[in-house]
Amino acid sequence: MEIYADQKYTKLVSHLYYQNSHEIVHSSKIYQLALTNPDILSQYINYPDESNESHESHDCHESQNSTHYKFRLMEIYHKMIIIDNNMDLLDLLFEIMSDDFRCDDCVILDLAIRHQRTDVFNKYIILGFDLNRLINSSTILDEIILWYHQIKKYDTGIELCDYLIDNGASISIHNYCTIINAFDTLNDKYVSFFLNKISLNDLGNLLFWYLRNYYNVNIDIVETILSNGIDINNFHEYSYMLIGKFNVPIMNLFIRYGLIIHDDVIDDACRYGNHLLVDYLMEIGHKPSKQIITNVIENHNVNIIKLFVKYNIDLSDIKPPTSPEIIQLVKSLESNGLSVDYVYGYILDKFNLSGKLCI
């Protein structure tokens, strides 16, 4: 690339370099283009810090470390694309290292999202840009959903999402967080749009992913997915791994939609130390296997042991392995007058105080 050689211009570039000494500015495409064209330097690089767009972004996206420098790019591109509509200059920018995705591209795509610029998206699509890659640590679809939910313009958000999906953005595991965010808005238009875009198989995968990865599961989102006809007893090949971890409201919901509770569900709940679910399952008639009862007692899971007592679980055949030395010691203590009740109580109390309540 040939750099414009005028001495006065070179001095301006040098001044800009040291005045804005930061990697994001120096490595930006607009800076590289400015080195070849003095008009770009005067019109865009030195554009004053007045763009309202930068203040919008300050509230929504930026981290403290790089805020000023990305604002600078936002101001420059806001003037170029939104105010001047200089698409010819944007074409020149795309010619600079077009295979290298940079901070500039994040800023430009962010502007395209906020100002409904499908013409800008189309330029990226022509260049072969992957619409499923991350910008600002999330997907383009996610940015659209969150932005248009924030400003309550759902129809516009849906139009943009539809355009991008038609041009290669996929609803896959890479965008599951996007769909959950859409469902989490509880906006009927967003929810209906994405439900119509997802196959039953992908919907089952989405449900599995959500239940496995989210700590605070929104039961309304779960019901939204369940109500769309997925096979609740076979929605994912590993769904059985999750059921024993359900909380009681989620289990109630699944049962209401036809979940068949197999014998191993209560065993899994015991294994995970999920005593609230174990209590619920015992109350409706399920009982753990002898092997799990033995494991619970061996590991002194006091909360589950209490439930065995509460529901009169027969423990007469349960004999956890104990070394002959320990058996002899207990018998000796008993023969010396120490109550066996005291021994059991002491051991359980010690495990309780040390927090060993789970298998």
From Swiss-Prot:
Q: Which InterPro entries match?
A: Ankyrin_rpt-contain_sf
What keywords were assigned to this record? ANK repeat, Repeat
Renumbered ranges of ANK repeats: 72-103, 105-133, 142-173, 203-234, 236-260, 261-287, 288-317
Gene3D superfamilies per the record?
Ankyrin repeat-containing domain (1.25.40.20)
| UniProt protein name | Putative ankyrin repeat protein R190
UniProt lineage: Viruses, Varidnaviria, Bamfordvirae, Nucleocytoviricota, Megaviricetes
